[in-house]
């Protein structure tokens, strides 16, 4: 089991490294802006400081999304690993289908948990730079993002056990994203006509629109993460047993 997990890390190490680099660049960009607001050129312009403060609080979760979704948003390595045909020889060893699938799910769970810890540390530093305390609200938001990453990754893993080509998974994932975007636009755009200057107050207005459902986002994401983890595991076991390499 340990060998399978180590193999998964070797196969996907390039993607982990790229996601961490993008997170570091994004977080460093936010930190440099904050330093300039405190003791740099921007600090001499109160209006610019006020505008940037509001903007940074809107995009404060961007580095978290970069590292979590970066760790979860790939499938090429798993397809290359499965399509290499090595698993057919596992039938001549003591490895079971449950162990093979479990190694995929466990290795990705460990990596996403590591990304989650990094995001919490970043958020603590970000809040301290603004003189704010880390609260349960911030933790639940990052946890919701972590659950979303779990859903994406385990959904892709489950499809990888059935599909022979990565284009199939990409087509399904993009189709679901487009349907969700269409539903979101159908909800937002008719209501935007009521605004006199939508570009100026768009972010604040969108926050107000989603205020009634904000309390349900975390429990719903947590529930779906559990469903995709448990259900995806057993479905993946069946898919790998029926897979012809």
Where do the language-model regions lie?
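Hydrophobic alpha-helical transmembrane segments of membrane proteins
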Residues: 1-85, 102-245
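Short helix-to-coil transition segments within interhelical loops
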Residues: 91-97
